[in-house]
Amino acid sequence: MSITKEFDTITAISTPLGEGAIGIVRLSGTDALAIAQSVFKGKNLEQVASHTINYGHIIDPNTGTIVDEVMVSVMLAPKTFTRENVVEINTHGGIAVTNEILQLLIRQGARMAEPGEFTKRAFLNGRVDLTQAEAVMDIIRAKTDKAMTIAVKQLDGSLSQLINDTRQEILNTLAQVEVNIDYPEYDDVEEMTTALLREKTQEFQSLLENLLRTAKRGKILREGLSTAIIGRPNVGKSSLLNNLLREDKAIVTDIAGTTRDVIEEYVNIKGVPLKLVDTAGIRETDDLVEQIGVERSKKALQEADLVLLVLNASEKLTDQDRALLNLSQDSNRIILLNKTDLEQKIELEQLPADLISISVLTNQNINLIEDRINQLFFDNAGLVEQDATYLSNARHISLIEKAVQSLEAVNDGLALGMPVDLLQVDLTRTWEILGEITGDAAPDELITQLFSQFCLGK
């Protein structure tokens, strides 16, 4: 996908294919109105007011056959998402009818849009910057209301504003350095001394480091916590999964080794998306299929952000329990003592004190798991502060880290007594790195790659 501006008219189906109440076929470009009018029987779309919805029928211009009864939205540039003329044909939902209309539009001169091309045009035409474009996809992919809140704030420009303001301050500092170098005789320009440059770079660094501190929380809310439920066979792992999901996804029996594979499901725990991985019970076994499940369980444990270790309170600790306690001790771990509704036989003195006693059967203390997750990952500070700007995108986080490193290089140079003009390079690099976040200084290949990840019609 080229990032040069293209002014042809593109089209795509913007709703998921399949049965539904409505389907939407979108057009964007200079000829959007003319192409839509060529297949529309109703008002003249080239003469209606902007941002109106118009009733009519889509017809095949070659045969005069009615394809569907539709409502057509007309939105004129520049007050559209792409800042081009946009037409949206609202059809009855269904694969056949939306595809038929799409093919008609292509035959009339529209081009099939590439993935993300509508949003790409919004970016190229200055409607959104790169962070806002990425926020569109984050909204689509958001698994919880908290993740959506962060994405909507980013789409609204909160991160863009912070980055742009910082870039402007850095640019002002660079300009002051340049004036001091090129016109040292100017008395009305403040001298960029070593002390003043140190003060400014430390200010920039502090701002970016504060932003980085939001990354852990933001990334969790955007991508979720990979959560492995581990334990020896028949301690209640699958029952816990079903309890958290509030539906029966895993097979629950009294037969050890019933779960032969890894089961993955997403669940919303107080705004945090947890990718729950119900693993096969980890034990020594001669069953080849179960052995494969056990190996996958160990791999899931190693890769997990959070480990829920389930023990059976109604039985004494086994060697398998002790092995799992050792195996998971370096993880973000919550130990769950299940089956506390039965007579307790487990040796509590051999276990860490911060375990949670639960009964999956009676739902006892399941809510405490949610509280412990908040304590482990959010320091009990709550999930989303209303006015805060969060980093949640791995690309943004990586670039902010690089920008901080460049500022550290400036401060290191100042400490070594390097001349101010020699430190311009690192300060300029900081300015360029921040520009990659918003797209002002992003390479063409990056922009192409980012938009290729979008869905068709967006």
Swiss-Prot record:
Keyword field: Cytoplasm, GTP-binding, Hydrolase, Magnesium, Metal-binding, Nucleotide-binding, Potassium, tRNA processing
Gene3D superfamilies reported in the protein's UniProt record: P-loop containing nucleotide triphosphate hydrolases, Probable tRNA modification gtpase trme, domain 1, tRNA modification GTPase MnmE domain 2
Chain segments annotated as coiled-coil in the UniProt record: none
Cofactor entry: K(+)
Functional note: Exhibits a very high intrinsic GTPase hydrolysis rate. Involved in the addition of a carboxymethylaminomethyl (cmnm) group at the wobble position (U34) of certain tRNAs, forming tRNA-cmnm(5)s(2)U34.
Positions bound to GTP: 234-239, 253-259, 278-281
Residues that hold K(+) according to the record: N234, T253, I255, T258
CDD domains, sorted: trmE, TrmE_N
EC id: 3.6.-.-
Occurrences of domain TrmE-type G (ranges): 224-378
Protein name per its UniProtKB record: tRNA modification GTPase MnmE
